[in-house]
Amino acid sequence: VGEINAYHMPNDFFSVYRSEGEAKMLPNTWHQVGISLWGRISDWRYEAIFTSGLDAERFGHNCYVHYGATSPYEYKLGNVYAGAARIDNYSIPGVRLSLSGYYGYTFKNTERKASASYDKVHGALAIGSFGLEMKRWNWIVRGNATYSHLADAQKMTTFMNAYPKHTQQDGSPSKHSPIASNAYSVGLEAGYNIFSQISSLSDKQKLYLFGRYEDYNTYAAGKQKVAYKYDRVKRMAVG
């Protein structure tokens, strides 16, 4: 889901940073046990997976669902389930266009039991993402746009904050942090191979002059949005 989980090797991004926005709001190099189906038909590559859901106890205002795939225990719980899918298209020479999505429940995916008042709380998480890459004419251009909605965010925040922190005997591994109901990340980077203009180097090496711009918010909507305005970040980088 997202560019960061499909194309995360060092030659898939400029500088030493992956997409900072996606890295903040999504699990990175996301791996979970599940059942997966993938393949390719002509210019289309597809992949789908059924797996356990994320753990809402690990969510937070400045990381959204980033830590949801981790576990504070020596094992990973699977009380709730989720599905994800991805399609990559290569119809245009040198260009990849991608769509990916995720949907699943996140609440009660922990050892902590909830009272009957939370029976209808599921913490449904939906993520949609678009990505692109172009490698032509000595240019590399990459872009990503990811949006997510989390249902029951306020009710889950109340549930998490009702328990002591993990440092106490009966504590919870929760971050005790408000959880956003929406988060987003958009980014664009472009680099030009300047060695392509030097005949003695054009066939041997590559040196890219690049720039990147990102705009992301891990607390784009929520009851305490005013208090967490700093979770919106605009970032520029050149190299």
Model-derived features: positions:
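Surface-exposed coil loops of outer-membrane beta-barrel proteins
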Residues: 1-88, 105-108, 113
